[in-house]
């Protein structure tokens, strides 16, 4: 793909197929130097969506849906009225606004609901989780017994950072705006490594060149 402008950027079809698969998405590179760097980075390793023998083979999933599963959610006010064994049955539900780089509790819920819900930033990274909703662990359709890597899929290519990835502790569940990573084998080093790489400047640059307002699974796969 070429332009007639002298300052235009050209891409080869083999590169576009490797960069975005069947979608043939065109990266938003501002100069030939950026395009050359993009092509070099995309040619070094297999795409994340490719199955590789003895690789980590990452896949992504949404654990619960904030709309479809809302009848199973317990508001924080109702959760605080429960005591002892009743309260122990519930796990916190993570929403997208709670997740930032290396921090799954960036914001805490204060009051309200829907668009009028009030949240505030936690004073320090790793502060106690204060969600808006809880859910009975027995009603969650996935295993919550281990740490998982996650990311916030509501983001933007013009934000200070596009990729916001963190580690979710066991016995917590993620809403649909916080997809989680699964690997072929259970090894705590894999989600830790994925979070570190996802939050790097290199991966952030690669991702922001291919998305607008939602970070979808196919962006990662390609």
Residue ranges and their predicted role:
Residues 142-146, 154-162, 167-221:
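Basic, amphipathic alpha-helical recognition segments used for DNA target recognition
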């Amino acid at each position: 793909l070429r332009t007639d402008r002298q300052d235009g950027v050209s891409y080869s079809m083999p590169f576009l197929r490797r960069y975005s698969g069947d979608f043939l998405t065109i990266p938003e590179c501002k100069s030939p130097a950026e395009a050359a760097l993009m092509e070099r980075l995309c040619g070094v390793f297999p795409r994340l969506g490719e199955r590789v023998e003895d690789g980590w083979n990452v896949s992504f999933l949404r654990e619960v849906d904030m709309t479809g599963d809302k009848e199973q959610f317990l508001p924080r006010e109702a959760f605080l009225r429960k005591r002892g064994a009743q309260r122990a049955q519930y796990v916190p539900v993570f929403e997208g606004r709670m997740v930032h780089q290396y921090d799954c509790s960036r914001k805490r819920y204060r009051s309200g609901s829907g668009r009028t819900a009030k949240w505030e930033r936690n004073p320090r990274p790793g502060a106690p989780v204060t969600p808006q909703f809880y859910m009975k662990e027995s009603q969650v359709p996935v295993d919550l017994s281990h740490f998982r890597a996650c990311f916030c899929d509501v983001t933007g290519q013009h934000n200070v950072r596009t990729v916001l990835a963190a580690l979710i502790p066991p016995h917590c569940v993620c809403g649909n705006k916080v997809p989680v990573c699964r690997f072929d084998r259970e090894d705590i080093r894999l989600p830790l490594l994925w979070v570190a790489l996802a939050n790097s400047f290199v991966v952030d640059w690669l991702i922001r060149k291919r998305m607008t307002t939602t970070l979808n699974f196919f962006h990662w796969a390609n």
